Amino acid sequence: MSYPPARYEGEHGEVSATYRPADHEPEVTYPSGNTVHYLATSASTDGLFGMYRWEFGPKPSGPSAHFHRSISESFYILSGTVRIYNGERWIDTVPGDFVHVPAGGIHAFRNESGEPASMLLHFSPGAPREGYFEGLAAGLGGLSDEERAEFYLRHDNHWL
């Protein structure tokens, strides 16, 4: 395996790093109390990846089993206990645990512990997941079945 083609051709490098302080307010807050922090978006990484900090409140929550056709999704647990479904069984993950789900891989995640929990979500390649997170937070209750199906399809979420 070799390195990918060069993405920067300059001779001396450039100042281009980004910084986001830990105490930055979340971009999305769900009615459940869960929050999403946009650490790196597809737009800010030139489509390479997206990275988000997901913070669960103590109420049970999380999506049911699904898969993505165009993106992989990885989970790195920061705090608490997060249940992750790997397509065969539920795994109780704890801080430091890592789960990678390739494109097409069946997965789900939930916090059922009654305590707050947090994790990093990494999507590769980058995709506009912000629209998905924000659409869910706004609520899909007013959408017809066809509109809801189109929303999920547009955001590469395929439910089982």
Language-model segments: which ranges?
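Hydrophobic small-molecule pocket/channel-lining residues, especially in calycin-type beta-barrels
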Residues: 61, 68, 82, 108, ...
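A short glycine-rich, His/Asp/Glu-containing loop-to-beta-strand
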Residues: 25-65, 71-72
